[in-house]
Curated annotation (Swiss-Prot):
Name of this chain's protein: UPF0212 protein Mbur_0968
Pfam families named among the record's database cross-references: DUF555
Family: Belongs to the UPF0212 family.
Disulfide bonds: none
């Protein structure tokens, strides 16, 4: 059995915000509030990075229209004693998905560690 570091991305909708910084703060706070009661404080939450198609500069994954933001969050957790990287990603999606119901999740990276 092997240990894995699994990275997921989540699409988080935030209403009634005017700036990208406000949207990021609210999204991270709301995600934390939903993870902590389930004792998932080991899940790292951060804003994702998107690259500009024109200049390739990185910027925070936030899009705002009509005071509603779509924030791309990155969720990271370690999975111990998984049979494969596929098994580790299923475990991570299941654990995080139970706390973040109705939030789209996608696996972006699975890395083995000792």
């Amino acid at each position: 059995m092997t240990n894995y570091h699994v990275t997921l991305e989540a699409a988080w909708l935030v209403r009634d915000v005017e700036t990208a910084d406000d949207a990021i703060g609210v999204a991270i706070s709301e995600a934390g509030k939903r993870l902590n009661p389930k004792k998932l404080d080991f899940v790292e939450v951060d804003v994702g990075t998107t690259y500009c198609p024109a200049c390739s500069e990185p910027f925070g994954s936030v899009f705002i229209a009509a005071n509603t933001a779509l924030v791309g969050l990155v969720l990271e957790m370690k999975v111990f004693d998984a049979e494969s990287d596929e098994h580790a990603s299923r475990i991570a999606k299941s654990v995080i998905g139970k706390a973040l119901t109705d939030v789209p999740l996608n696996v972006v990276d699975v890395e083995e560690f000792d």
